[in-house]
Design a protein with these regions (language model features):
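PP2C/PPM-type serine/threonine phosphatase catalytic domain
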Residues: 1-388
Length: 388
């Protein structure tokens, strides 16, 4: 499949269909892996109660046609339990989001994310008519001065350093609104019992969508964590303690999933752990003509022919998106900036050497999903026995 400036909308539809089908394939109930060539770990677990894993977590890496560095997008979607087609809604959210990021990658990161998130909202709304939906949390790294994050729903983004843990995202729940606007100093769990943890907005909602944007700098010596509510239910304090006592991203991700199971495993639990500084150093290593997508269970590679998008194709896409997107315009945004400078390192090697290095990294970084099987995977008696 070739994607580029002279491509038709059909090529992006094919890209979307392939990513969606791959994300929605049947998998075992739990897996954890370190993403080859990137200092990222992703993990998911069905838990001990749910019959279906409606979480999706994945990483996208490709070289935008108009830019000199690769773009890495880490995203997590949590299909809404109890609503129609939660698992498919999450798959549709991520596949649409990734496709639109590739399509609009020539724009600024925030403009690109805005278009991609609104398109994902339209896609889920079209299928489920407001009766199904998903959260969406994403982190984008492209070598810019700041790292851009975005979220809709109650999946979270945390910044982690030796100094502690900071929530960078904003929860779209009744509990969070009550705490924000009533200035009452209670823990989130107390708010949930008083006001409920219902989402006030999500991907697939039939109303104005407010996307929460955050700009951060690289947490020196730290990491960024994306988590579904089934994972961060263990509490910020425990998330921080586990980080302080974990030697790498894979071990940290595994321990979060395991502790969520020890807490009862009442919901699906998924995380992505990102060593930002390590990724920033590798953005000069080109993905070439390949779009890479990873989830906790495997890797997908798609051919991409990078060219500058033509105004003609952009106008076609804009007119097609315009009707529904106007209804779901973004209102506002939030910006947070930490005071830590990021470091970048230039690379000066030819294409063949780069390819060899990437192959070597692929061989060195093995999937640890089978070696580090989670607590719930070892002890749960639910599900298809053939999956174990």
């Amino acid at each position: 499949m070739l994607l580029g400036g002279s491509v038709s909308c059909d090529s992006y539809e094919i890209l979307h269909e392939q990513i969606h089908g791959w994300l929605h394939r049947k998998n075992i109930s739990a897996s954890i892996r370190r993403v080859s060539t990137l200092p990222v770990a992703i993990a998911t677990d069905i838990g001990l109660v749910r019959k279906e894993n409606q979480d999706r977590v994945a990483v996208l890496k490709f070289r935008p046609a108009s830019k000199s560095k690769d773009m890495v997008v880490v995203a997590l979607a949590d299909g809404m339990g109890g609503m129609e087609g939660g698992g498919n809604a999450a798959s549709l959210t991520l596949s649409t989001f990734f496709t639109e990021v590739v399509r609009h990658s020539y724009l600024s990161v925030r403009e690109c994310l805005e278009k991609a998130i609104l398109k994902a909202n339209d896609a889920v709304l079209k299928i489920y008519k407001g009766n199904g939906g998903s959260t969406l949390t994403a982190v984008v790294l492209d070598g810019s001065e700041y790292i851009t994050t975005a979220n809709v729903g109650d999946s979270r983004i945390y910044g982690l350093t030796n100094d502690g843990i900071v929530q960078l995202s904003e929860d779209d729940t009744l509990a969070a609104l009550a705490k924000k606007y009533n200035n009452i100093d209670f823990e989130a769990s107390e708010f949930d019992s008083r006001f409920g943890g219902e989402l006030v907005q999500f991907i697939g909602i039939d109303s104005v969508l407010q996307i929460h944007f955050f700009d951060i700098t690289a947490p020196q010596g730290g990491a960024v964590l994306l988590s579904s509510d089934g994972a961060h239910t263990i509490g910020d304090n425990n998330l921080n303690k586990l980080f302080m006592h974990s030697s790498n991203t894979g071990l940290y991700a595994k321990r979060i999933i395991d502790l969520a199971s020890w807490f009862g495993g009442f919901d699906n639990a998924s995380v992505a752990v990102v060593e930002v500084e390590g990724i920033l150093k590798d953005l000069d290593v080109s993905s070439g003509y390949v779009i890479n997508v990873w989830d906790p269970f495997g890797e997908l590679k798609l051919v991409n022919l990078p060219q500058t998008l033509s105004n003609h194709n952009e106008n076609q896409a804009s007119s097609a998106d315009g009707k529904q997107s106007e209804k779901n315009k973004v209102q506002g945004g939030v910006v947070k900036k930490t005071a830590v400078k990021k470091k970048t390192r230039s690379r000066n090697s030819n294409a063949k050497n780069i390819e060899k290095k990437e192959l070597n990294k692929n061989e060195e970084l093995e999937n640890i999903s089978q070696l580090d099987m989670s607590f719930s995977e070892r002890n749960s008696v639910k599900g298809d026995k053939n999956e174990r």
